Amino acid sequence: MIFETLEHILTHISFSIISIVILIHFMALLGHEIVGLRDSSEKGMIATFFCITGLLVSRWSYSGHFPLSNLYESLMFLSWSFSIIHMVPYFGNHKNDLSVITNPSAIFTQGFATSGLLTEMHQSSILVPALQSQWLMMHVSMMLLSYAALLCGSLLSVALLVITFRQSIDLFFKRDQLLTGGFSFGEIQYLNEKRSVLQNTSFLSFKNYHRYQLTRRLDHWSYRIISLGFTFLTIGILSGAVWANEAWGSYWNWDPKETWAFITWTVFAIYLHTRTNQNFQSANSAIVASMGFLIIWICYFGVNLLGIGLHSYGSFISN
């Protein structure tokens, strides 16, 4: 009873803190960035991390098993994973471009877990026989950590595409305006020189230098986080195969969840190939990662919505 009450309190505290953090970020977007508020938001995410950690530990204490047995627990663990990813640049003293992604992601997953699911789904229950294994912690935690990392990396790639697309549109309209407005020979020479600089430096110009630096950082962080998520996903799939052989007598059954996990792995393997290949631009790999964003949600929620297959124990449909 004490642990259940503690879990309830920590749930509301963590959700309240992260809501305030989101509000601070909106204030920073609407007005001038205040250093004190920025630092407060970072500390707020750290406090959220410890609250969710306490929540999961409390649930583990009174349930008797690692809290990854149903959809509610997996969503809370996913929110916890987002907070971990958020803190990595902070403690590394890097500019935290991830906060725009991790903060809304954490509040969305936790908000959906606490308010979007039926109350009955919040209750901890006895593990089904297939889940009564030491592989539960290894397999499911690796998969959820990979989802969090891959989602963050994919959203950074989406942001990269948006900035690149907007710049292409701006350049198109500026060129169209010059062509329709008439210009002298000197202006033609200037336009050709400017076009040459843009082509050779990939958006690097004096006017767009800040935007260029932003796209470089987005591409850098997207690649690093997706690489980490891909590693977690690989470990999760391999550990799941070993667990499946122990529980069902086969390493791979082409279950819907397994099939989509394989598709997810393939998509991000293609991303890593295009990203490390010098013949492809960063926008090409960003397109692949953006496709991966949708595929991850299908992999995570697809089976839960249908309630079929060997992984249906975490579905929306009560068993």
UniProtKB/Swiss-Prot annotation:
The chain crosses the membrane at residues 17-37, 44-64, 71-91, 143-163, 225-245, 258-275, 286-306. GO terms for molecular function: heme binding. GO terms for cellular component: chloroplast thylakoid membrane; plasma membrane. It is a multi-pass membrane protein. Pfam families: Cytochrom_C_asm (PF01578). GO terms for biological process: cytochrome complex assembly. Its main location: plastid. Keywords: Chloroplast, Cytochrome c-type biogenesis, Membrane, Plastid, Thylakoid, Transmembrane, Transmembrane helix. InterPro entries: Cyt_c_assembly, Cyt_c_biogenesis_CcsA, Cyt_c_biogenesis_CcsA/CcmC. It is found in: Plastid, Chloroplast thylakoid membrane. May interact with Ccs1. Belongs to the CcmF/CycK/Ccl1/NrfE/CcsA family. Required during biogenesis of c-type cytochromes (cytochrome c6 and cytochrome f) at the step of heme attachment. This is Cytochrome c biogenesis protein CcsA. It comes from Ceratophyllum demersum. The lineage of its organism: Eukaryota, Viridiplantae, Streptophyta, Embryophyta, Tracheophyta. The gene is ccsA.
